Amino acid sequence: MPVDFHYGVRVDVTLLSKIRRVNEHIKSATKTGVVQVHGSACTPTLSVLSSVGTAGVLGLRIKNALTPLVGHTEGSGDVSFSFRNTSVGSGFTHTRELFGANVLDAGIAFYRKGEACDTGAQPQFVRTTISYGDNLTSTVHKSVVDQKGILPFHDRMEAGGRTTRLLLCGKTGAFLLKWLRQQKTKEDQTVTVSVSETLSIVTFSLGGVSKIIDFKPETKPVSGWDGLKGKKSVDVGVVHTDALSRVSLESLIAALRLCKVPGWFTPGLIWHSNEILEVEGVPTGCQSGDVKLSVLLLEVNRSVSAEGGESSQKVPDSIPDSRRQPELESPDSPPLTPVGPFGPLEDASEDAASVTSCPPAAPTKDSTKRPHKRRSDSSQSRDRGKVPKTTFNPLI
């Protein structure tokens, strides 16, 4: 069966080795995620996506890390290919191998098996080739391309010109993360994160408790995080309007932890107009390469928690209820005796007949039992020990 080569890129392993620390920090979350090659066909972007908690999406995007192969015929247009980071039934993890320390060269190729003339068909398989530094060892891994095609959505968020954002200093971020962990229980919890333009405060509310963080508003027009990174020991924010988001507590805790990479990123909050809260890793210094790390926290539906509370308060049918009406009588059952205000309405003759017809009750065993005699303290015969009997022994 002929093999149709569709698209291929060469990986800049030198750039990936410089940001290996970021991959080591998030490798537990991205192991079960998805690797994406998307963007322009001439300058594609390498991304790693993974779910965080119950309502969060982690995204690591690296630009200028992929170079298209010379044999690619379609030089213009956009590409979007997705495949699992860890293949099903295999222990091969793409990010672990591509970010390795002893990697000399790496390439990713997308192809399909079928007629070569079918140029419009999507690729079916991906082949990852890795050569190591000893010039002898190499690895070739083949896996399946996701046919559904996950569209890259991190770059489609609104531009950072009019967004409300807050940069947390290291001390505030550690204190907030500790407080959120103390409020966490085994159940799914929703935390409300609101920011006030007038008061210059951010409020985290859940379960009847709240935590308020004051920040210094930035009045000068800034572009992105560049105008906020100068004040390291102060919480600085740019607020254009009041904003509110309801997110999962589990996802928020994980996002603050993942976006805190010592020497690389510190967490910052962004409120989007579509009620999505984004926790972005703000670079702390001059980084090598265009790397972006962020977690999108989706809006949690309030009706889900309300339905859960009603279902927990529902009384099961097996518990008897005194307010229930009496069951209907069958035609074979005897009629009920009407009851008056002072007792059942019956004739005196019927009462007398019922009394005389009943035989006397036989005495029970408990009633015939003789009463227990109380032992007196003066009786010393019962307090003495058992005296052995003296009998005739013929052997003596």
Swiss-Prot record:
Subcellular location as annotated: Virion tegument; Host nucleus
UniProt main location, coarse: virion
Pfam family, one: Herpes_DNAp_acc
Tree of life domain: Viruses
Region annotation (Disordered) ranges: 306-396
Function according to Swiss-Prot or TrEMBL: Plays an essential role in the viral lytic DNA replication by acting as the polymerase accessory subunit. Stimulates the viral DNA polymerase activity and appears to function with it as a holoenzyme. Increases the processivity of the viral polymerase, probably by acting as a sliding clamp that prevents dissociation of the polymerase from the active template.
Subunit structure: Homooligomerizes and adopts an oligomeric ring-shaped structure composed of 6 subunits. Forms a complex with the DNA-binding protein, the DNA polymerase subunit, and the alkaline exonuclease.
Name of the protein: DNA polymerase processivity factor
Gene that specifies this protein: ORF59
